[in-house]
Amino acid sequence: MSKRHSGYQRQRDDVNETPFWVTRVVLPYLQQHCLHVWDPANGPASKIAQVLSGEGFDVIATSDDFLARTSLPHANIDSICTDPPYGRDGGRLACRFIEHALELVPVVVMLLRIDFDSGKTRTYLFLDCGSFAHKIVLLDRIVWFEREGADPSGNHAWYIWNSKHNGSPSIEYAGGERT
């Protein structure tokens, strides 16, 4: 698999909303394991929060400094579901998001690049982490920014950690038309 530059000129603090279909892909897992979900990275108007609220989840969405938080925004939060910032440091910011989320809640659901679990420096989050439970590979590419003549170039997956998980992680494939 190769990566190519999209040609999109990023702006400081620009927002790339997670499309509705992407969140719908992870609904079956969330419906089995979660009731009260926190999206700490996309703000109250996030599309993730909209989908989850529409499906009956109790959702809190914030966009403050997640890594500085030492407690949950509400005591009954049982999961975090978000599209974390990756940062320009090779994904280290996303790693810190995952680490912090695992300290706060029993179920963590993160939308990440498909090869995020491939790095040997991240084995502590995957291979060596008993709570890593499931990966849902998106068969359709996410269109983050509408641009004429541009095709999306990145592949993504939902990564799920569950403190109650026992055994090897599982993998599933899903796409926009299938949800």
What is each residue range found by the language model?
Residues 1-179:
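Class I S-adenosyl-L-methionine-dependent methyltransferase catalytic core
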